[in-house]
Amino acid sequence: MKTIIAEKPSVAREIARIVGATKREEGYFEGGGYAVTWAFGHLVQLAMPDGYGIRGFVRDNLPVIPETFTLIPRQEKTEKSYKPDSGVVSQIKIISRLFNGSEQIIVATDAGREGELIFRYLYHYIGCATPFVRLWISSLTDKAIRDGLRNLEAGSKYDNLYLAAKARSESDWLVGINGTQALSIAAGHGTYSVGRVQTPTLAMVCARYWENRRFTVEPFWQLHIAADGGDGDTVKFSSTGKWKEMEPATVLYNKVKDS
């Protein structure tokens, strides 16, 4: 049997229909020599600091740089902490059984960096050794799926894509964990979230906000010209340039008027 893993149930359903896996089981479809299962986004994530024995925000613990990153099932937030998402844990068990009982895995997660990471993190977390190939398609038409299945590619072709995604994931963790803890400790109260993407984005929003708040109206001069466009129409033009002083605007105005 071969197992196909898609990134979400809707994609798995379309692929299952094409390969004849019409029998619905818990967490997958089966039939025609295939099992077609699915993730729902990232089922596996990098462990939080407490996974490395680091609890709370303590200055002496910074920077937090794990020698080796640990993978854990996706967590959900509770009132005081985080716990494994029960639905995710259940799906991982199903996928693990299918992967380890198959002769080959066909990776049908999204054709991109994150899609590759979703599968690889899951594959490594399970500790699977079953060989895998890549279904690389960007459309879910019947033709695209069939063509992709006829032209499966070696999984190793996308090793560098995985490494790029892994580097992004780990850098986000390092910036987020260390930045958040450092800023929160420095502030002395509350938790201040820092992120590789979210913090520069917030800075842009804040900068624009203060530009608007501090904006003061200043007079300027601009050229406006009206010309006969024919058939009784008037064509109006405005200069792209604006001047804070009247003199240079007047000089240009006279040049245009005299030309």
Residues covered by each model-derived region:
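Intrinsically disordered, low-complexity regulatory segments
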Residues: 1-169, 173-175, 179, 240-257
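Prokaryote-biased recognition of long, low-complexity C-terminal linker/tail segments
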Residues: 6, 168, 172-244
